[in-house]
Regions:
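The serine-hydrolase catalytic nucleophile loop
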Residues: 55-65, 375-376
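N-terminal cap/lid segment of alpha/beta-hydrolase-fold proteins
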Residues: 1-44
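Alpha/beta-hydrolase active-site loop
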Residues: 92-144, 172-221, 231, 235-243, ...
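Gly/Ala-rich beta-loop-alpha elbow adjacent to hydrolase catalytic centers
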Residues: 155-165
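Histidine-bearing beta->alpha loop at or near hydrolase active sites
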Residues: 85, 395-404
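Short beta-strand/loop motif that positions the catalytic acidic residue
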Residues: 358, 364-366, 370
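Catalytic histidine-centered segment of alpha/beta-hydrolase-like enzymes
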Residues: 54, 90, 401-413
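Conserved alpha/beta-hydrolase
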Residues: 65-89
């Protein structure tokens, strides 16, 4: 039985403001984590569904158990419907470019949701109003501290979702995009939505704590000044949130803004910028100073530290379930350079589209009876990638499992292997 989502809500895609359906799931111990200010244990995950025209959605029978497993292991999990899937607006694109941007949009909302939870807990659980002040729109909410662990984000996808995953830019590039968001744009709206959700969570945790404290005092079980831990008291899930955070007078559609054209240009230029972004990410994570050429411009929008606060440090990990390697899938594959990490033809000697899987902890898992890609080709790709990635890449071929994991015991084996890998990321 999959868990109930804490929130079901919508966000605009940073591609063209297409409305996307999203869910956020909470692990059981989230309230306790926030009350005890143990925010170093906060982890986020996003998992993408299969091809929408073939029935893919966030209710997919593989997506749901994988999401449930991640929740059980302590992740705050985000799932979503790509454009054209479920209740999301728009249509599935022929190039996949829109789906890549849809995924980036969900990365933004999950990342800033966790960022707000982190900051508020570190400030002594001083809960903020769900309505943003004007000052808060213009400053960052996360001030770094020495010894602060990077936020762990797991990015995953199943089948077509893994193809989209393979075309994502580095996590630091996505992070910068939201930190520099201009008020009224889709990216800014996503940051606002993330903060509103986080503040609602913090308020719910505090309300439950006060409820427990009052009930215990009335029973005489504890003294007046004793602490209490939160438990759920009949709260109905999920909380449904739609509409927009930004005042309609301030809201600017991405397709109407000069910035949207700049973002398209950046997407086209991504292969040339990949190495620079990876150097930037490595320097941030390892504490190395950046060269002048690698430094990002100071954020000026609502999402990041234009007030002098330190940037949010993020570590990315990747999970590919039943990756699709057949050349026949190029018609539905996302845009960009050929994906050598997925074994597609036309590999360029200079193409590094698979570098993210080589540089970050990655697990690929597939069945030996996959009908979309032969077991021989999957094993050859996985073996080669493992060799190139040294210790960062792991893979598992589940005997007898097909692409849809419908065989007896197949989903359980999938869950067990992913759980084992996730435990190594702590």
């Amino acid at each position: 039985m999959p868990p109930e989502p804490a929130y079901s809500f919508t966000i605009p895609s940073v591609e063209d403001d297409t409305t996307l359906e999203c869910r956020i799931y909470h692990p059981a111990g989230l309230g306790k984590t926030l009350l005890h200010h143990n925010t170093n244990s906060l982890r986020g995950a996003i998992f993408a569904h299969p091809y929408a025209p073939l029935g893919g959605s966030y209710d997919d029978p593989v997506v749901l158990p994988v999401a449930a497993m991640l929740v059980e292991t302590g992740y705050v999990v985000g799932t979503f419907n790509f454009r054209g899937a479920g209740g999301s607006h728009g249509k599935t694109s022929w190039t996949g470019k829109g789906e890549v941007e849809d995924y980036c949009s969900v990365v933004g909302v999950v990342m800033h949701y966790l960022r707000t939870l982190q900051h508020s807990a570190r400030q002594g659980s001083e809960l903020l109003s769900p309505v943003m002040s004007a000052d808060e729109r213009n400053v960052s909410g996360a001030k770094g501290s020495h010894g602060e662990r990077p936020l762990s984000i797991l990015l995953g996808g199943y089948s077509y979702g893994s193809l989209v995953l393979a075309r994502l830019p580095p996590i630091q590039a996505m992070q910068q995009r939201f930190e520099e968001a201009t008020m009224g744009t889709a990216a800014a709206e996503i940051v606002q939505r993330a903060r509103t959700l986080a503040k609602q969570t913090l308020k719910a945790v505090e309300d439950e704590r006060q409820h427990d404290l009052k009930a215990s005092r009335e029973r005489g079980a504890i003294p007046e000044d004793a602490p209490s831990s939160p438990v759920r008291h009949g709260r109905t899930f999920p909380v449904l949130i739609g509409g927009e955070e930004t005042d309609s007078a301030d809201r600017r559609r991405s397709r109407d803004t000069p910035r949207s054209m700049d973002l398209v240009r950046k997407s086209v230029d991504f292969p040339k910028r990949l190495k620079a972004h990876m150097r930037h990410g490595s320097a941030l994570q390892e504490g190395h100073p950046l060269s002048e050429g690698d430094k990002c411009h100071p954020p000026t929008g609502i999402g990041g530290g234009g007030d002098g606060s330190s940037p949010l440090l993020v570590n990315a990990h990747y999970l590919l379930v039943s990756p699709v390697l057949l050349p026949l899938t190029t018609n539905i594959a996302p845009p960009g350079p050929p994906a050598p990490q997925l074994g597609l033809r036309g590999r360029s000697a200079d193409s590094k589209a698979g570098a993210l899987f080589l540089q970050h902890a990655t697990l690929a898992i597939f069945g030996t009876n996959d009908t979309f890609t032969s077991n021989r080709r999957l094993r050859a790709w996985a073996t080669k990638t493992e060799r190139e990635a040294a210790r960062n890449f792991e893979w598992q071929a589940v005997e007898g499992a097909g692409h849809f994991w419908r065989e007896e015991g197949a989903v359980q084996k999938l869950r067990e292997r992913v759980t084992k890998w996730v435990e190594t990321l702590r």
